[in-house]
Regions:
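Compositionally biased, charge-rich terminal segments
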Residues: 32-35, 85, 108, 112
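Short alpha-helix boundary/capping and kink motifs at helix termini
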Residues: 2-62, 69-72
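A short, basic-hydrophobic beta/loop patch
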Residues: 44-107
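A subset of signal/propeptide-processing and intrinsically disordered low-complexity segments
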Residues: 5, 96-98, 109, 113
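Alpha-helical interaction elements
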Residues: 102-128
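Compositionally biased, low-complexity repeat tracts
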Residues: 17-19, 39, 85, 103, ...
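Exposed alpha-helical structural elements
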Residues: 31-35, 94, 120-121
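Exposed, low-complexity/repetitive linear segments and helix-based recognition motifs
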Residues: 7, 98-100, 124
Length: 128
């Protein structure tokens, strides 16, 4: 079983896959702005998924980019997160990218990209 730890992360300590040179920077298009607007309105979200970057105090964001953007827009300083071990976190980030591509291909009607976050939440419930 993968050890998942509930933490609060400073928003300034988050790094994306693209910022590390491991992914593509995606533009903030109309669709993404719509998701962020909805999240800002809702105000309560599932925790993001992060992986610690060794000896740096920073975290790799593996799931939850839209939630982070909404939190920044709301001027929040921190966000609730689930910390995954590095190997699992990188695998989750890769899987999440594939699932987002599937969602995009089918007009975001399959909600495949939600699978990663739901899995992590279920894992924390099983540990309690």
């Amino acid at each position: 079983m993968i050890k998942i730890k509930k933490i609060k992360v400073d928003l300034t300590k988050l790094v994306t896959m693209a910022e590390m040179g491991l992914g593509v920077v995606r533009p903030l298009n109309k669709e993404k702005r719509g998701w962020i607007k909805k999240l800002k309105k809702d105000g309560v979200w599932d925790p993001i998924l992060v992986t610690p970057i060794r000896d740096s105090g920073y975290y790799l964001l593996t799931d939850g980019w839209h939630r982070v953007q909404a939190a920044k827009a709301l001027k929040r300083k921190t966000i609730n997160a689930l910390q995954l071990p590095a190997d699992a976190g990188l695998s989750m980030a890769k899987a999440n990218k594939i699932l987002r591509d599937i969602d995009r291909q089918y007009g975001f009607k399959l909600y495949c990209s939600d699978i990663i976050g739901h899995w992590a939440m279920m894992q924390t419930l099983l540990e309690e």
